[in-house]
Amino acid sequence: MTPPWITLNHPFPPALPVLPLGARAQKRYFGAMSVNITFLGGSGTVTGSKYLVSHAGQQLLVDCGLFQGFKQLRLRNWSPLPVPASEVDAVLLTHAHLDHSGYLPLMYRQGYRGKVHATAATCDLCAILLPDSGHLQEEDAAFLNRHGYTKHAPAQPLYSKHDALLSLHLLHPVSWGKPFAPLPGWQATFTSAGHILGASSILLEVAGRRILFSGDVGRPDDLIMN
């Protein structure tokens, strides 16, 4: 099943750092233009990267990752987002690792139908990783039910392989170094971050503000990156 890739390109606007915040979802307002960043993950812990940027009634999510590791962290994947998925207007992915992309199938199941912008390599990797993640979620639930290791009746997967396959149709590839408009009045520019194939840093510009999301960085000279 090949998702209908679409590339968007538009013109645009100009400086501000993202400040480190605590482990819980926290907000930071930047001046009268009220650009609001809510840290939903990747803060206080490495995994679960989700950064909700809000302005003038529009909401854009940078990364959509799963919490991984200890049980207390994994349980956070079952908590609803503070904003209904259907009210998020666009998603940008820095790269395909599940702690940055693995929540997408759940977003789809919760009603998100907007575009998910990522490099072509990230889209291709997500087409492998997300269905595999859904399959493993189903396998884990089946194992718990088969051996009676669950307090729930029955244990359910966080999402299914089918959910993951459906979510792939939201992916829209973008190119490095080519600014585009993920939403009216917003500009995003992806640049190479090394790390893995397709990994990007994302410069987001809105309301005269510039916010750089580095994503995961490193190893830009590995042969596989070239």
Where are these regions (language model features)?
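N-terminal metal-binding scaffold of metallo-dependent hydrolase/deaminase domains
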Residues: M33-G48
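Catalytic core of the metallo-beta-lactamase
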Residues: N36, L40, S54-H55, V174-N226
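Pre-active-site segment of Zn-dependent metallo-hydrolases
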Residues: S43-T45, H55-G114, A118-L171, V217-N226
